[in-house]
Amino acid sequence: MSFIAIIPARYASTRLPGKPLADIAGKPMVVHVMERALASGADRVIVATDHPDVVKAVEAAGGEVCLTRADHQSGTERLAEVIEHYGFADDDIIVNVQGDEPLVPPVIIRQVADNLAACSAGMATLAVPIASSEEAFNPNAVKVVMDAQGYALYFSRATIPWERERFAQSKETIGDCFLRHIGIYAYRAGFIRRYVNWAPSQLEQIELLEQLRVLWYGEKIHVAVAKAVPAVGVDTQSDLDRVRAIMLNQ
């Protein structure tokens, strides 16, 4: 099964300026992500960036890169520009690999692409089990609940589902019903073309979760439990320091 991995790599991060070029073990972070995407078996890996310095770094590493506009509001909009630039067919499978996930397991990139190919949804994603009450009640850990066929019912920063009987007694322990959404997505190219024409939804603006726009407009998102748990992504300097330490010990 063939698929294309696209890595959005926005240069102007508020908390970590120039993040795609942050050095990790002698390579820019975006190059680490690109190498993991290539290891997944993707037919093609394209970095989508808004900055010429990122273009130079990717090309120096032998990668393929597309210079996009700087005014996109989301990574999905950046993907849409790349899809139109290359003229990908509507049924081509595109995997959005976050540019700040230098430790992303290649197996889950392949997994989310395979899952989309096997279902009728326009979009697929992954989740991992939540084992601690601290994570279950953390609004930065996005929870997802699914139906019997493995399609998302809802994503929320709130604690869903709510264990009424258990939590009436204590919130110190949780059951095995909680899943944390992880930010890797597969789409059919035609779905992205439709998506970018939809106005933002009320729910996504309340929760600040872009994927809720898909459910708002009546589309399905396939969800599966990831075969591997991704390590920390890079949002802050402390995250970057942790990733550098992990890489140093590998």
Swiss-Prot record:
GO biological process: CMP-keto-3-deoxy-D-manno-octulosonic acid biosynthetic process; lipopolysaccharide biosynthetic process
Enzyme class, UniProt record, top EC level: transferase
Subcellular location: Cytoplasm
Family per similarity comment: Belongs to the KdsB family.
Biochemical pathway: Nucleotide-sugar biosynthesis; CMP-3-deoxy-D-manno-octulosonate biosynthesis; CMP-3-deoxy-D-manno-octulosonate from 3-deoxy-D-manno-octulosonate and CTP: step 1/1; Bacterial outer membrane biogenesis; lipopolysaccharide biosynthesis
GO cellular component terms listed in the entry, alphabetical order: cytosol
Annotated gene: kdsB
Gene3D superfamilies: Spore Coat Polysaccharide Biosynthesis Protein SpsA, Chain A
EC number: 2.7.7.38
Catalysed reactions, semicolon-separated: 3-deoxy-alpha-D-manno-oct-2-ulosonate + CTP = CMP-3-deoxy-beta-D-manno-octulosonate + diphosphate
GO molecular function terms attached to this record: 3-deoxy-manno-octulosonate cytidylyltransferase activity
Protein role: Activates KDO (a required 8-carbon sugar) for incorporation into bacterial lipopolysaccharide in Gram-negative bacteria.
PANTHER family per record: 3-DEOXY-MANNO-OCTULOSONATE CYTIDYLYLTRANSFERASE (PTHR42866), 3-DEOXY-MANNO-OCTULOSONATE CYTIDYLYLTRANSFERASE, MITOCHONDRIAL (PTHR42866:SF2)
Protein name: 3-deoxy-manno-octulosonate cytidylyltransferase
Keywords, ordered alphabetically: Cytoplasm, Lipopolysaccharide biosynthesis, Nucleotidyltransferase, Transferase
Cytoplasm as UniProt keyword: yes
Disulfide links within the chain: none
Pfam families: CTP_transf_3
Organism: Yersinia pestis
Listed SUPFAM superfamilies: Nucleotide-diphospho-sugar transferases
